[in-house]
Amino acid sequence: MTAQLQPVERRVVDLRDPSLLVEKAYVAGEWVSAADGRSFAVTDPYDGAPIADVPSLGVEAARRAIDVAATVQKDWARRTAKERSRILKAWYDLIVANADDLALILTTEQGKPLSEAKAEVLSNAAYI
């Protein structure tokens, strides 16, 4: 008898804000797919159900991200402390406001308990 694998349905992560689960890579200020169209599946470790397909970027995309980050960092350094503080506070507020969804994504992707994932999200927000 030969075992046959059954196709696993794509897992739908029930987010309040589905726009938080982006199936692209953020490079140089924009969401992009791989230049060659390659991607790989992110799966739920519990049952292997696919959650998302994300770009499999190559060396050129990594170099571009590094080059742009180095340039943007110079702009960041020229901002006043007050400006940087305002931007970081806004980022912090967004993380806290979306902590439940971010924790659900983390739980689905890594298999950790939801309460632990939410604590991780909020703990990391505190670093900002």
Residues of each region from the PLM?
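Terminal low-complexity tails and localization/encapsulation signals of metabolic enzymes
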Residues: 1-53, 86, 90
